[in-house]
Amino acid sequence: ANLESVLMMKPDLLVGWKSTFTNKMLQTPTFWQARQANVYIAESSLGAQSALTMDMEYKYIRDLGRIFNRNMEAERLIQEMQQSVAYTVAQTAHEKPPKALFIEVQGKHFRLYGHKTLAGNIGASLHADVIDTETPSISMEDVVEQNPDVIFLIVSDGEYSQADVIMNYVLTQPGLQGVNALRNKRVH
């Protein structure tokens, strides 16, 4: 949504990421507070120095439950999520952890979502061997060298309508055709 559309809605609460509330996007929290609108910024978007975790997401869900007076629904959702994780871990405990790559397409390189990211934490929590490097990006050559068993594509907020194009881009890269994830149709 753009600023004009949001202003026309006359919200009393806006929920978003840190990047949502800048002068280039939907303005700052001060802008909205002057219009009697509260702002909730997800903790996971604040650029924490520590790793982003599922526990932070559980906190986010609990916070929204409190804000909207839906505590029981929030706790039920968290419980379902935790049960799904426990089930997956139990079902895969006897298997070798798959080598998992979490990436976002950025030109000819990929932004890497490693252990300190929420995606990487989810992968590790679900019994995956998460591929990580010292740098925030990974080249196609490095993807070939790492040879992941599964690739998860991260599609950012403004690119949801392009998800199929992004998937097709990865699936049709000649240099990636020998990668296990592509050969075994495990790109998600």
Question: Predicted regions: what is each one?
Answer:
Residues V170-K185:
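Short beta-strand->loop
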Residues L14, K99-E104, I151-L153:
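Short hydrophobic beta-strand segments
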Residues R111-S137:
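Alpha-helical, coiled-coil/dimerization segments enriched in small aliphatic residues
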Residues A86, A124, I138-E141, Q146:
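Small-molecule-sensing regulatory modules
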Residues L7-M8, W32-A34, A93-K96, H115, ...:
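Extracellular/periplasmic catalytic domains that process cell-envelope and extracellular macromolecules
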Residues A1, D132, N180:
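Short, solvent-exposed loop/beta-turn-alpha elements that line the ligand-binding surface or hinge
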Residues T28-V105, K185-H188:
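Extracytoplasmic substrate-binding proteins
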Residues A1-I67, E141-E145, D149-I151, G158-T172:
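Acidic/His-rich segments in extracytoplasmic proteins that coordinate ligands and/or metal ions
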